[in-house]
């Protein structure tokens, strides 16, 4: 992407090593932390080279036109940030991403974790991603507060009943689709039994209902990236998508079929449709 004139920004989330805060899996706090990066890239937020030297760093090189893309949990954060309606976020490309955390962990009031993750729940994923714990000095100063945060998550997620409550509603980004100003290019695997298609399809349908520019590419893979998948033309489509929504290039990508589905019998064939 650099050779095509794009700069790449990598950002650690709340609770990651050398960061601050706690990992709270899909919470409003996590979403707003990533949103702050978009604000910084657009000159609305200050940033510093580190936490002690008070040396400010500006994103003066940025046009203010920003895209977000990632897979799985990080792709989920792309959706979350888009639902804030933050100015400057022109498009997102979430791959194998979650649009509703309740539907990821619960089905009909039952606990239904991803395949291979039996016993998993929201607080366990938060603990798994809490890499601040890998810094002994840092962790020693926060471990009691973090233990309290874990206890609060365990109570709020209400595993015993499986009920949908305010805790889960905060993590249901479908509630805020009408706030999205960015275009959306969804990529998902039909055979993904980690993040299932009950995440991407309701999201795409909600985008259609709101008239938000959207594209969905469903491949036959599992919980994977498909950038180099033979016959998918994924990278070419992504390049043209970004050229249009970040650089304003009139290349017709927005007029092409909105849905592409890889054939299960011939993986060189992609079925196209204007809607799902």
Where do the language-model regions lie?
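Alpha/beta-hydrolase-fold serine-hydrolase catalytic core, especially in secreted/extracellular enzymes
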Residues: 87, 208-276
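Conserved alpha/beta-hydrolase "acid-adjacent" motif
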Residues: 193-199
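Gly/Ser-rich "nucleophile elbow"/oxyanion-hole loop immediately N-terminal to the catalytic nucleophile
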Residues: 24-29, 36-72
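Short beta-to-alpha linker loops that shape the active-site pocket of alpha/beta-hydrolase fold enzymes
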Residues: 7, 12-16, 98, 222
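Extracytoplasmic/secreted proteins, especially bacterial periplasmic and envelope-associated proteins
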Residues: 29, 33-36, 68, 76-80, ...
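Accessory cap/linker subdomain of secreted extracellular hydrolases
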Residues: 3, 31, 49-51, 61, ...
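Short beta-strand/loop motif that positions the catalytic acidic residue
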Residues: 180, 186-188, 192
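Short amphipathic alpha-helix adjacent to the substrate-entry channel of hydrolases
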Residues: 1-9, 204-208
């Amino acid at each position: 992407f650099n050779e095509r004139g794009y700069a790449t920004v990598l950002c650690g989330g709340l609770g990651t090593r050398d960061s601050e805060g706690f990992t709270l899996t899909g919470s409003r706090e996590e979403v707003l932390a990533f949103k702050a990066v978009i604000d910084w890239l657009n000159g609305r937020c200050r940033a510093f080279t580190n936490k002690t030297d008070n040396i400010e760093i500006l994103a003066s090189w940025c046009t203010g036109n920003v895209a977000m893309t990632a897979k799985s949990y990080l792709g989920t954060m792309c959706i979350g940030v888009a639902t804030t309606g933050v100015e400057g976020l022109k498009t997102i490309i979430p791959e194998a991403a979650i649009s509703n955390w309740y539907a990821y962990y619960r089905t009909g009031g039952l606990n239904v974790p991803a395949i291979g993750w039996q016993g998993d729940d929201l607080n366990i994923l938060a603990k798994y991603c809490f890499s601040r714990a890998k810094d002994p000095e840092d962790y020693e100063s926060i471990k009691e507060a973090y233990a309290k945060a874990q206890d609060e998550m365990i109570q709020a997620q209400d595993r015993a009943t499986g009920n949908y409550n305010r805790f889960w509603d905060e993590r249901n980004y479908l509630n805020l689709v009408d706030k999205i100003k960015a275009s959306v290019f969804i990529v998902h695997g039909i055979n993904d039994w980690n993040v299932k298609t009950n995440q991407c399809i309701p999201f795409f349908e909600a985008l259609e209902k709101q008239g938000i520019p959207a594209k969905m590419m469903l491949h036959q893979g599992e919980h994977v990236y498909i950038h180099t998948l033979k016959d998918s033309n994924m990278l070419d489509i992504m390049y043209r998508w970004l050229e249009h929504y970040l650089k304003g290039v009139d290349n017709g990508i927005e007029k092409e079929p909105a849905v592409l589905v890889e054939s299960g019998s011939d993986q060189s064939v992609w079925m196209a449709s204007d809607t799902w």
